[in-house]
Amino acid sequence: IDIVILSVKPKDAIQAYKEILKNYKNPKIVSLVAGIKSSTYIKLDNKSEFMRAMPNTASKYGQGITALYNSSFKKSNFKKVSSIFSKFGTVIEVDNDSKIDTFTGVIGSGPAYFFQTLKSFEKKLMRLCNQDEKIVREIIANLMKGVGSSIEKDGDLDNLIKAVASKKGTTEAGLKSLKSNNLNQIFEKGLNAAIKRSKEISNEF
């Protein structure tokens, strides 16, 4: 199977798609472009096979998550493409464009939310523990690896929180402060803003 990967900024996607159509006859196209619906492309050409894929940046380490939506790929070809993306991490198949938009805002953008949060850890450790940046980042990386392993083995986030937060202990104090400052609502608003923007991009084309 020969496929063409469409991986450009949304503002350049339609022109790039038209160039692909000029140079390939009935191409098999996998779009990595955020926001733009399959129907937007298919209106320009309904003979090509087309699907959307939305990986996140951890794919380059083989630990990514990729959402796939099959618009018009033959089933056998879709399976082959899915197999390719599975080499870069977990693959999730969704059944409509809207779910790709949701995935983009939550999982596609997800690493940046964690990185932003971890900057607070980095800043605090460097200031209080007098450690250099390299050591602090190694500590944070191992912290996140441990979190990931805990989720894989247990899975229940409430149980994992209870296992760390002793009554009247340091973790409980920290969690109470985060809750009183509406951390969950802040994250919810951030996720909703990203999903909204993904849908706005879709409506621009």
Language model regions located:
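A short acidic, helix-capping loop that chelates divalent metal ions and anchors anionic groups
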Residues: 60-64, 102-104, 173
